[in-house]
């Protein structure tokens, strides 16, 4: 079975969030099932620089006004197709934002081009001697792919649309529609028209053969007005085609027994070795050495991620005998609030702005607990990394966080299956109560070690999730 996966980012070439990790890791998990994946991504400068060997395998003479080349390459076992079109992707900023942090004004064109290229590859034999059996697209940036396929080269080829975060929908004014190379019929409620605008994600959800999202709980949540972000009605009408499949993690990249980014390697049976990583973490963040748990945050600093709650509870962590380290960037007001907390509590709270992949590994390996107080969370990956590294997750009871972490309540502790802490409501007081629960457990060394051990023994690999994707793909092909 051949799959064309289409995404705006893929680890390790370009990453702004968990989408890249998923797109980079899933193909390897599918391979043992006889499923071969080729992943199409834009040719950003950062991507092209990292491709050691690449060869042109296809060409567009005119893709949104400019010629484009499809390059084939392989990185970390991922079979890549890279859409090289400098007019759209050769930018100084990131994948979506310019160097000042603003959306590129032509993002609609940049990602429509990616989607149209995918549709042409799927249906018109752009790549010699290769065609996919199924096209799998990820998030709004690639959501027009099934729309182009419906009106163009591959109307009957099965498609899967995965929602990683429904909050990001790719909505643009109706004035962009004439530039999308779609027939007039596509600007209707059955396709891309969305309250008078053009909705990329909406179009994909209307036309894809199947819809997935990244956890069973989130699949249920997005059917409600509270979490559906205006698309709950559409999704409810397609509930029979909607599946929630939890993400896994790359067990080779995230392995505390071999991780090159941490000074002390350890496993479930050698947890005491984590002390070497704690020491390195304290030095990196300028923390005073001493007892008490270190809490960490590795996140975009946004309201959705509950970072205002962390800022409000930061002083309480210190007052209760804990420490806090933060890695992230985002809302300037939240950055300032967290930096102010660090200034008030020097030696007890440390912060690094931006994103640093090696540092995120050290934080998981050296901190005792990771705070994830998201107001909504489709799946989340940082809690899975926490399980793998014995960094006990403290999570809001929402979405994929609910599905992946077993709360340390009395029943779960008795059954020896607890792996972390849930809290609800998702408020500052709710988080404070959870922090107190963590401290009580931390002060019982045997209980704490058992929580870490149970988390580290959890199966957070892609194995089970890959089986579910294979079942979905097979069912689509069986429909004909």
Swiss-Prot record:
**A GO cellular component entry from the record:** cytosol
Q: A GO biological process this protein is involved in?
A: glycogen biosynthetic process
What InterPro entries does the annotation carry? Glyco_trans_1, GS/SS, Starch_synth_cat_dom
GO molecular function list: alpha-1,4-glucan glucosyltransferase (ADP-glucose donor) activity; alpha-1,4-glucan glucosyltransferase (UDP-glucose donor) activity
Name the Gene3D superfamilies on file.
Glycogen Phosphorylase B
Q: Does the record carry Transferase as a key word?
A: yes
Query: SUPFAM superfamilies from the xrefs?
Result: UDP-Glycosyltransferase/glycogen phosphorylase
Q: Which residues bind ADP-alpha-D-glucose?
A: 15
> Which UniProt keywords are listed?
Glycogen biosynthesis, Glycosyltransferase, Transferase
EC class: transferase
> Can the keyword Glycosyltransferase be found in this entry's annotation?
yes
Under Enzyme Commission nomenclature, its number is: 2.4.1.21
Identify the metabolic or biological route this protein is part of.
Glycan biosynthesis; glycogen biosynthesis
Catalytic activity as recorded in UniProt: [(1->4)-alpha-D-glucosyl](n) + ADP-alpha-D-glucose = [(1->4)-alpha-D-glucosyl](n+1) + ADP + H(+)
In the record, the note on similarity to other proteins reads: Belongs to the glycosyltransferase 1 family. Bacterial/plant glycogen synthase subfamily.
Task: Tell me the HAMAP family matching this sequence.
Answer: Glycogen_synth
What is this protein's function? Synthesizes alpha-1,4-glucan chains using ADP-glucose.
Query: What's this protein's name?
Result: Glycogen synthase 1
This protein's species is Rhizobium meliloti (strain 1021)
């Amino acid at each position: 079975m051949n799959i064309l996966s289409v995404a705006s980012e893929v680890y390790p070439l370009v990453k702004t969030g968990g989408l890249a990790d998923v797109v980079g890791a899933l193909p390897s998990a599918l391979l043992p099932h006889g499923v071969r994946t080729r992943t199409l991504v834009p040719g950003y400068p950062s991507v092209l620089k990292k491709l050691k060997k690449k060869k042109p395998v296809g060409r567009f003479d005119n893709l949104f006004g400019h010629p484009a080349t499809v390059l084939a390459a392989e990185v970390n076992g991922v079979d890549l197709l890279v859409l090289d079109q400098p007019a759209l992707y050769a930018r100084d900023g990131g994948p979506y934002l310019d160097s000042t942090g603003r959306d590129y004004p032509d993002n609609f064109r940049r990602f429509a081009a990616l989607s149209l290229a995918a549709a042409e590859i799927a249906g018109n034999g752009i790549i010699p001697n290769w065609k996919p059996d199924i096209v799998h697209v990820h998030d709004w940036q690639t959501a027009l792919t099934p729309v182009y396929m419906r009106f163009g080269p591959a109307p009957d080829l099965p498609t899967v649309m995965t929602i990683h975060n429904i909050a990001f929908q790719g909505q643009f004014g109706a004035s962009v529609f004439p530039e999308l190379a779609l027939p007039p019929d596509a600007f209707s409620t059955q396709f891309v028209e969305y309250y008078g605008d053009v909705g990329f994600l909406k179009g994909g959800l209307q036309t894809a053969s199947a819809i997935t999202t990244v956890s069973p709980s989130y699949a249920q949540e997005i059917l409600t007005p509270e979490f559906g972000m205006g698309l709950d009605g559409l999704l409810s009408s397609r509930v029979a085609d909607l599946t929630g499949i939890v993400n896994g993690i790359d067990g080779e990249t995230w392995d505390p027994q071999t991780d090159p980014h941490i000074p002390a390697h350890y496993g479930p049976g050698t947890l005491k070795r984590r002390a070497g990583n704690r020491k390195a973490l304290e030095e990196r963040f300028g923390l005073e050495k001493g007892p008490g748990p270190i809490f960490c945050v590795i996140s975009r600093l946004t309201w959705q991620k509950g970072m205002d709650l962390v800022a409000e509870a930061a002083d309480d962590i210190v007052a209760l005998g804990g420490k806090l380290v933060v890695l992230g960037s985002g809302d300037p007001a939240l950055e300032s609030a967290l930096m102010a907390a660090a200034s008030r509590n020097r030696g007890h709270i440390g912060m690094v702005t931006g994103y640093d992949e090696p540092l995120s590994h050290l934080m998981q390996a050296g901190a005792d607990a990771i705070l994830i107080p998201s107001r909504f969370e489709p799946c989340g990956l940082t809690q899975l990394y926490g399980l793998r590294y014995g960094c006990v997750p403290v999570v809001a009871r929402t979405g994929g966080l609910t599905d992946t972490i077993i709360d340390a309540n009395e029943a779960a502790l008795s059954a020896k299956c607890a792996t972390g802490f849930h809290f609800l409501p998702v408020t500052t007081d709710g988080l404070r109560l959870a922090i107190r629960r963590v401290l009580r457990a931390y002060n019982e060394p045997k209980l704490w070690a058992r929580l870490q051990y149970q988390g580290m023994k959890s199966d957070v690999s892609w194995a089970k999730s890959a089986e579910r994707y294979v079942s979905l793909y097979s069912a689509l092909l069986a429909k004909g």
